[in-house]
Amino acid sequence: PNERVPEYTKEERQRMQRAFGYTYESLKDSILPMAKNGIEGTSAMGTDTPLAALSGNREPLFNYFKQLFAQVTNPPIDSIREEVVTSTTVYIGAAGNLLEEKPENCKVLRINNPILTNTDLMKIRSMKVEGFKVETISIVYYKNTSLEKAVERLYIEADRAYRDGANILILSDRDVDDNHVAIPSLLAVSALQQYLVKTKKRTSLSMILESGEPREVHHFATLLGFGASAINPYLAQDTVKQLVDEHMLDKDYYAAIDDYNHAIISGIVKIAAKMGISTIQSYQGSKIFEAIGIDKEVIDKYFTNTVSRIGGITIKDIENDVNTLHSAAYDPLGLETDVTLDSKGRHKMR
């Protein structure tokens, strides 16, 4: 990895993994097969695990959303045999006024797929090109303070960046430590997406997420579906480095990262194809999900117009879940904590 990209010690990495809800299964059954084979791990059809709202575990917010699929109107696409009609290319930057054609509208950054390596993000962050201005906004907040207030602060920071001329926002939770907790990445992305739409600023800004939370294909699909333009899963990629260093992967770091990223993007294309969508750009911001077990007030405020037939967790419940995970990684009393990853039995009976 590039020297200028932040790296973690083994203990720091384990604490971050626990803070973001990683389990032993996340490494063994999700990240390892993808980094090893370049495709998602194979498993049996069907699931008998409890819904996230009924689970006794602290489930990530991603798991409260179910993917929809085409049933009547646009037919699904075979993403393998019809790969020629699919595209993973995305464009980052201000979209300009769609009703006024002019050359400035075409000044965007073209990237081959929305899953960024640490080096890719570093290049975008340090870009000094006329017509592009990149601003990083932290999506962490001081522990024991309000998650709802932290989201409101995110709106204020985005408004400030917009006034300063930024057209690319990087939402980053790299500052998580013993005193700072991350806003759940899906909540941060969707809340800001809805705010920018309501204030008529969305087409002037692109959102890139730099987060340690996403690691499975469904996580990335929800983030793109709720408004992210691109995602840098820095902790998942650092976990791949861990697997290489521990000789659980018989390949070099760069090849393993390429295979992991390829598995993620292939999985996203497959999910989009179920709805008859052939390009990632068309899938972005589409919100083709159904929420199960989230309170109506949370849906209306942060996931506006998302299908939701039953209520459930409130913003306070989400805050409590985040704080519980953080306390398991960074003991609030400053005592030594066991940072070994738990096995939750999500993929196999325990």
Predicted regions and their residues:
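Non-cysteine beta-strand/loop elements that form the S-adenosyl-L-methionine
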Residues: 229-236
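Short gly/pro/ser/thr-enriched loop/turn and capping motifs at secondary-structure boundaries
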Residues: 237-244
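Flexible, glycine-rich loop/tail regions that form catalytic "lids" or insertion modules at the edges
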Residues: 1-150, 154-161, 165-168, 214, ...
